[in-house]
Amino acid sequence: MMKSIYILFLLASQVIFAQYPKDYFRSPLDIPINLSGTFGELRPNHFHSGLDIRTNNVEGLPVYAAADGIIIRIKVSTFGYGKALYIAHPNGYTTVYGHLQKFSDKIEAYVKEQQYKQKSYEVELYPSTLKVTKGDVIALSGNSGGSGGPHLHFEFRDTATEKIINPMAFGMSKLIKDEMNPVISSLMVYPANDSTSVNKSKAPVSLSLQKQVDGTFLASKVYARGKIGFALNSYDLSTNSYNKNGIYKVATYINGSPNFKYEFDSFSFDESIHINYLIDFNRYKKLKQRFQKLFIKESYPLSLVSGNAKNGFLDIKSNVNYTFKIEVFDFHGNKTIVNVPISYDKELKLTSVSSKGNYYIKTKSDYNFEFEKTTVYIPVNAFYENVSLNISEKEGVLDIED
């Protein structure tokens, strides 16, 4: 039954994506499209909401309206997208153009008039009469706002809901040459709780990967007892770009049955904060390594994720051998596969792990701790999962560590 539901979900996803117009929009640039950032890419505290298109390390390239429409928003800022344009199109979608150097003469004149009126360089404007035609030059590419180098940020949204949609779904994928498979640089296996062991450890264990004759990868064998989950560090490459960009989709299987999946097709802005639960945030905080978890301990509202009843976890039992398969895709269908052999650990000799905190916080409860000079209040759902914290006070200074 679960397999049928999973297949139906995949078919529904394909039907929804097929509904997006593939030839309605043109490229915003007249140069070969190479990417320095992909849709859904993992960024600090958010998912990347569009494509970052390389402009060959220069500014001043003509930026074109992707289709007929009306400019509904103009923003000038010293951070974020810098100088940005938002064009609503009659088919219900909005395109966004960010990090611009300069607007076209007509738009620039309107913006300057409003800046003088407001006596401010930074403005956010909502015009209703600035119409554009497909192929009009609307701006010059730049490096404004929070940009790390010259490029164009190009984005698609549903005009009515503001939901962000992968630009590849609108035909952008046809403009990008990509014959390279994603790369899985690291793979880790995690004990889910204190009663679980992985390779005789209660701490996460790194697995080695060996490439096989058929192009797939075989991970080192896992001996486990109890519930376990996996996480990977991965990136995508394209044919004409050296950037390590974000991957599009991950799907996992246990002995052939669907286990867990996430796919960067679309998401809403208020979902973006959940990136810190999709990744191993503690590892990122300490080592600056982004490992994407292939499991969830507590349900949370992230539409990108789908899984089975165990939320991606594997319950390793005696007298059963398991093969855990991971498939990592880019939008062009290039795929990397890792197979992980797993057996039940009959001999349990555990290595020591670091001590737990002095307070155990459950995500579905609230807490109030009073010290001599300070008070700590932790509301319900302050954490994505149960956590042990060391909380102490010294000379009126509160110290909280996980």
Predicted regions: what they are:
Residues 243-248:
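Short coil-to-beta strand junction motifs in C2/discoidin
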Residues 349-352, 356-359, 387-402:
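Proteolytic processing hotspots in large secreted/extracellular or virion-associated proteins
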Residues 315-321:
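Surface-exposed, short loops/turns at beta-strand junctions within beta-sandwich domains
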Residues 94-128, 195-197, 206-217, 253-315:
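Exoplasmic/lumenal beta-rich domain surfaces
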Residues 206-207, 321-323, 331-358:
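Short beta-strand elements
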Residues 139, 158, 236, 328-332:
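Surface-exposed loop/turn motifs at beta-strand-loop junctions within extracellular Ig-like
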Residues 18-95, 101-106, 120-128, 133-134, ...:
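Surface-exposed, glycine-biased beta-strand/turn segments
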Residues 1-24:
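Bacterial Sec-dependent N-terminal signal peptides
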